[in-house]
Regions:
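Membrane-proximal, proline-rich intrinsically disordered regions
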Residues: 8-64, 68-72, 80-83, 87, ...
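Aromatic-residue-lined binding/catalytic grooves and analogous aromatic/hydrophobic interfacial grooves
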Residues: 8-11, 46, 151-170, 183-212
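Sec-dependent bacterial lipoprotein signal peptides
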Residues: 1-7
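Secretory-pathway/luminal and periplasmic proteins that interact with or process carbohydrate-rich
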Residues: 39-43, 117-127, 204-206
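Conserved, well-structured interaction surfaces
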Residues: 61-173
């Protein structure tokens, strides 16, 4: 008669996914978010916006010109702005803020890009999720008023400008696809973006007054 028994290893790690990272470099999150943001601006948003504004002529071969309003691309741009851009930048900010010492330039770069993405999203769609968005804590974030979103973007830029150290590059520098860690250029960009948003808010107020 033969008897067999089975048992688990004493220190079994079967509940630990070996393919899932438990820590991440904020520089990689930043480069991933910036790449996706640029891709969305060039590929996902260019052609539908250009066609709707009659900047492009498709010759009748594009679906939009045939009144075939497929939401795939537009919804993709909306969703991926939050999942691929805002979410990754939020995580990068959290990691940079908890590092010792706090990497202020990294936080500033992430917040500037985040303000850029939120401003673009709001100027395209109006009221959007902002205060509760991309935190990983709220499944159905509320929609904030467009004016509140743009004001929040300005506040985000002011916070970032106050953190910039032009003499330091920080941990994101090797993965900075825009300015290679040159914080003086990031400061110029943040100020230019702030001016652009302020002009947009002024125009929005004029439109609201005009239409009553």
């Amino acid at each position: 008669m033969a008897i067999s028994t089975t048992a688990c290893f004493k220190d079994s790690n079967i509940n630990v996914d070996p393919n899932r990272s438990t820590s991440v470099d904020p520089a990689l999150l930043f480069s991933g978010a910036s790449t996706q943001f640029s891709l969305l601006r060039v590929a996902e948003l260019t052609w539908p916006i250009a066609l709707m504004n009659q900047m492009w002529a498709s010759g009748g071969r594009w679906g939009l010109s045939q009144a075939q309003y497929d939401q795939t691309r537009i919804r993709s741009a909306w969703g991926r702005t939050y999942t691929d851009v805002h979410k990754n930048l939020n995580v990068a900010v959290e990691i940079a803020q908890t590092s010792q010492p706090v990497n202020k330039n990294a936080v500033a770069q992430c917040k500037i890009l985040m303000a850029f993405a939120y401003a673009q999203t709001s100027l395209l769609w109006g009221d959007i999720p902002f205060t509760e968005a991309a935190t990983g804590k709220v499944d159905f974030p509320k929609f904030d008023k467009q004016q509140d979103v743009l004001n929040g973007c300005i506040a985000m830029l002011d916070e970032a400008l106050g953190m910039i150290d032009p003499n330091g590059k920080g941990i994101i520098a090797p993965n900075d696809l825009y300015y290679g860690g040159d914080m003086a250029k990031w400061r110029k960009f943040a100020n230019s973006l702030k001016m652009r948003i302020l002009i947009s808010t002024k125009l929005l107020k004029m439109i609201i007054i005009t239409i009553g």
